[in-house]
Amino acid sequence: MGGRFIVFEGVEGCGKTSQMQLCAEWLQNLGISVILTREPGGTELGVDLRRLLLQKAEDKPIAEVTELLLYAADRAQHVAQELKPKLAQGKYILCDRYVDSTIAYQGYGRNLDMNLIHQLNDIATGGLTSDITIWLDVDVEVGLARKRGENVGLDRIEQETIAFHRRVQQGYANLAASSPSRIIRVDGQLSKETVHKTIQEILSPHLKEWL
């Protein structure tokens, strides 16, 4: 049985982290060995990069291109140290964010050069793409309200303007339209149970082929 790479994507507060955990529990109950990881922060080096990237904007401002390069560095380390070796061992990996986040946030959100972003993604991933990406689609105001309700303070990205987050959301919509077989949209504003069931229904046919 070969390894599989499933990514969860979406704007802030879309519920992807909770849904990824529920998905992992479901797969484990089916007897599948699962690894949960995230970007940024999927390695020891990545933990340090995550702290730099998400600290509040007023603490230490980060230039937009610097931000892009730090995300690429995190991804390169993650792919080399964790993703490729674990997939080669036949593991199922569930990842909270991957290359589509960079396209949506730094490409659409920051309006950085898409050719540069694709080049950096190609270098960082070495061609590794997800088998399936679950895009949890929620209205940006709903997602940010959820984050504020957590009472833990907003990080540097979450503090961005509504206009920024709307551009990110449009980026995800465009990505899903251009890669419909890889990126599957799920309505993230439905109940947690309904979203989880929908994800099960999406993945079940693939599991029959993979197992």
UniProtKB/Swiss-Prot annotation:
It catalyses: dTMP + ATP = dTDP + ADP. ATP binds at G10, V11, E12, G13, C14, G15, K16, T17. One of its GO terms (molecular function) is dTMP kinase activity. GO terms for biological process: dTDP biosynthetic process; dTTP biosynthetic process; dUDP biosynthetic process. The keyword Cell division does not apply. Keywords: ATP-binding, Kinase, Nucleotide biosynthesis, Nucleotide-binding, Transferase. GO terms for cellular component: cytosol. It is an enzyme of class 2 (transferase). It comes from the Bacteria. Its EC number is 2.7.4.9. Gene3D superfamilies: P-loop containing nucleotide triphosphate hydrolases. Pfam families: Thymidylate_kin. CDD domains: TMPK. NCBIfam families: DTMP_kinase (TIGR00041). Belongs to the thymidylate kinase family. PANTHER family: THYMIDYLATE KINASE, UMP-CMP KINASE 2, MITOCHONDRIAL. Phosphorylation of dTMP to form dTDP in both de novo and salvage pathways of dTTP synthesis. This is Thymidylate kinase. It comes from Trichormus variabilis (strain ATCC 29413 / PCC 7937).
